[in-house]
């Protein structure tokens, strides 16, 4: 609800201002036409607040700035929440997406994020401070990010596990 006579739109803009945007991968494609080469760009963008909310967006455009802007908008629409236990994840999880497999393991306090560059970026923007990750298989950044998001979505807190077991 709106507080202190602020509109819901202003509240949403304020919440979005807390988000950090990171360009993870840019690809330039060229098409040979009669007049020469025509370039187009694709961009993979991450958006996170460092408090457990993270999103990614993939967009294409003829101009690089347009691809980045569209990717950021797609990332904001694709936000998910990440369950944490303190500074780490609740349990170990392995996920395969296309050719990429990602293994996430909880780590003790003070370990830091031990992961490859693309997986590390996702985990850091999600606000996870202590985790070990291993990327197996494909090194395609898009598939790595999608596999990492699948892994994050499969994470359950202790309370959710207890509810499922009926304890």
UniProtKB/Swiss-Prot annotation:
Q: Which SUPFAM superfamilies match?
A: dsRNA-binding domain-like, Ribosomal protein S5 domain 2-like
Quote the protein name from its UniProt record.
Small ribosomal subunit protein uS5
Quote the function comment for this protein.
With S4 and S12 plays an important role in translational accuracy. Located at the back of the 30S subunit body where it stabilizes the conformation of the head with respect to the body.
Please list the residue ranges annotated as the S5 DRBM domain.
19-82
Can you supply a Gene Ontology BP term from the record? translation
State the source organism's domain of life.
Bacteria
A cellular component term from Gene Ontology for this protein is: small ribosomal subunit
User: What is the organism field in this record?
Assistant: Protochlamydia amoebophila (strain UWE25)
């Amino acid at each position: 609800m709106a507080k202190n006579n602020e509109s819901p739109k202003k509240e949403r803009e304020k919440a979005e201002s807390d988000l950090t945007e990171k360009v993870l991968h840019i690809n330039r494609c060229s098409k040979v036409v009669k007049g020469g080469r025509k370039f187009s760009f694709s961009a993979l963008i991450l958006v996170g607040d460092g408090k457990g909310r993270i999103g990614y967006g993939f967009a294409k455009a003829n101009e690089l700035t347009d691809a980045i802007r569209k990717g950021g908008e797609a990332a904001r629409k694709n936000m998910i929440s990440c369950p944490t236990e303190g500074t780490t994840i609740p349990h170990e999880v392995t996920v395969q997406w296309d050719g990429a497999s990602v293994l996430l393991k909880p780590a003790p306090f003070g370990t830091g994020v031990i992961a490859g560059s693309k997986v590390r970026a996702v985990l850091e923007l999600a606000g996870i401070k202590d985790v070990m990750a291993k990327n197996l298989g494909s090194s395609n950044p898009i598939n790595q990010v999608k596999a990492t998001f699948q892994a994050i979505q499969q994470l359950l807190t202790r309370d959710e596990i207890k509810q499922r077991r009926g304890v």
